[in-house]
Amino acid sequence: MQINFEPMPNSVTHLENNSPSRLKNNKTVEEHKEHEPDLQTQSEMRRESNGSPKDTAVTNQNGDQPHENVIHTQIIKKDNPFFNYMQDNVDGSDENGKNDDDDENAKNAGSDDNEDQLLQPNRRKNSKERRRSSVATSKDSSPDVPYNTLNHNASGMTKEGKKRAQILEASKVSEGQGRTYIAYAIKYGDSIVKRRYSDFESLRKVLVKLFPISLIPPIPEKQSLKSYGKAMTYSKSSYLLPTESGDSVDLSLSVINGPVTTNDEKLIRHRIRMLTSFLNRLLKNQEITKTSIVYDFLDPNNKNWNDLITSSLTISSLPKSVLQCNPIDPTNTTKAHSYLPVPSSSTQLLASKDNHSASDADEFTKIEAEFKNYEQLIHSGLYKYSRATTKEVNYLREDLKGISSEFAQLSTDETKNESGLAELLSHSSDAYGTLQEILETLVGNLHYNINEPLSECAHMATAVRDLIHYRRLKLIQKDILERTILYKRGQLIKFQQQENDHKQIDNMVKEELGTNGAVNLENPAGPQSYSGKFINKFTQLAIIIKDSVSYQEQDPAAAARSLEKELIQLDETLKVATSDLVVISETLKNTELPNFIKERDEELTQIFKNYAKYMKENATRNLEIWKELHNRIQEA
């Protein structure tokens, strides 16, 4: 396909490839449990904070004032989407005024501090270095657990070594006269470009025309600008990523990975994730990346995407309907494609159902039904019940938090009596508090790594059904052409028959008129015989018929010639439609559908593995807590 989009250079800035399965100093995830406070340490902290139920601001060991609703999610390097960003800050510390000639101990200490920041981004190591942000959570809030996209890591590169796009923030932009829109800052490589939702929508429409038989990933549904803009207005800086000059990686500041408190904020995050997935799926598509359209979309030099599209001769020359494009190369659409009918009425769609061949009904009709069933199973089945499970786990977390608080209050009351029951109640309070923290992490994992990927799988199934529906419309298109040709041929036979009838009538009239072509219609002087009267009546009737044929009906000969030319054009168009249908069917069966099924199976496998992993980790940690509580009760 030749498209007038110049591809961007293939130079890729070398980024350090940090394996997600390993941490600094070759420490595994399990070895970093030392960064998590043990049950005893948490017990001491909780005794101080829960000593009086009315005291909400209690100073902790570091001199901070812990907030009751602050998220304390343990983030390891493997799950940290900003690891590469922090690594760049560490490597470029000389730009911040630090001395590169520090001794080895200072370097090691700095490395440990940075590592601790990555592992526990929501905890302040030094109050003079950065200020801790307080984030209030509610029933709908979720801990900051990043969404691990398949085949992507946190360094901005895919496993294949290709760059990936990342939406850094969503901000409200004014375009004058009181009109505003939401702009998404997209980082690709070393460049950042801002695009609005209509730009994403326009890009997808163009891609559907340029690649009609390729699976184009979906984008999130268009939402009301009023509600969406309102969410952005009141979000302020709490939902923007850290600035480039910042030395903090506090995920609570991120619209992508931070905790959320309202449904509007969830909407913002959901749209950012869906649009990010849309761009990265396009960058993985080999057919689409052969052209430069996606790279032009990510190029900051093209500030106005709409102007670029409207000024492109390639895009403007495409037919309005994708059904009139050449499916192999829409930029090389022939004249015969312009004569293809565009099925628009529901009557045509319903009438075509009973006229398809048995083989087609057994093949693609069955495939479409299977994908429809798959979409329903994912969206109305797994996704629905997974969301319900996450909601119930979150409710359980809140209940455990309340139980922990009540045990702490009872422990305080029993302390006055100087009985051993106070210590047992304190241990129980600590255990329930730790359990709710574990469930907090589980809720975040289920929401971001299970629910949202399942929702994306359902949307991808919808895109596949749209592709199958396109093939079905092409089949209806071919059916309409066949019906039209049959009708036109019937009309041609009718006109040819009329022309023959007219010739016969003319011959009969000429025979009756005689060689001079005239007849005396006046009454003769003498009486006429019966045969003479009959001939006169027949002559008058023949003249009337000839006049009526000449002045009331279309010339059969001219109509027949016009139909013959039209049938020639229709036959050529039918050949094109038949050829297109064969190409579309083969591409869907042999390429697009198998590739989608393969990717779908990989994504679902990863989702189910994550689900089993999170549940196992939660159960293991629960068992450890209850065993530790049991041992303390036995010792008491």
UniProtKB/Swiss-Prot annotation:
Residues reported in the UniProt entry to bind a 1,2-diacyl-sn-glycero-3-phospho-(1D-myo-inositol-3-phosphate): 196, 198, 222, 271
Positions of the UniProt region annotated as Disordered: 1-68, 84-163
Biased composition (Basic and acidic residues): 27-49
Domain PX: 160-305
Keywords from the named record: Autophagy, Endosome, Lipid-binding, Membrane, Protein transport, Transport
GO terms, biological process: autophagy; protein transport; retrograde transport, endosome to Golgi
Residue ranges, compositional bias (Basic residues): 122-133
InterPro entries according to UniProt: AH/BAR_dom_sf, PX_dom, PX_dom_sf, PX_Snx41/Atg20, Sorting_Nexin_Autophagy
Molecular function as annotated in GO: phosphatidylinositol-3-phosphate binding
Transmembrane domains' residue ranges: none
Bias (Polar residues) ranges: 10-23, 50-64
Assigned GO CC terms: cytosol; endosome membrane; phagophore assembly site membrane
Main subcellular localisation: membrane
Intracellular or extracellular location(s): Endosome membrane; Preautophagosomal structure membrane
Lipid bilayer topology: Peripheral membrane protein
Family of the protein in this entry: Belongs to the sorting nexin family.
Swiss-Prot/TrEMBL domain comment: The PX domain binds phosphatidylinositol 3-phosphate which is necessary for peripheral membrane localization to the perivacuolar punctate structures.
Its biological purpose: Required for cytoplasm to vacuole transport (Cvt), pexophagy and mitophagy. Also involved in endoplasmic reticulum-specific autophagic process and is essential for the survival of cells subjected to severe ER stress. Functions in protein retrieval from the endocytic pathway.
Protein name: Autophagy-related protein 20
Source organism per UniProt: Kluyveromyces lactis (strain ATCC 8585 / CBS 2359 / DSM 70799 / NBRC 1267 / NRRL Y-1140 / WM37)
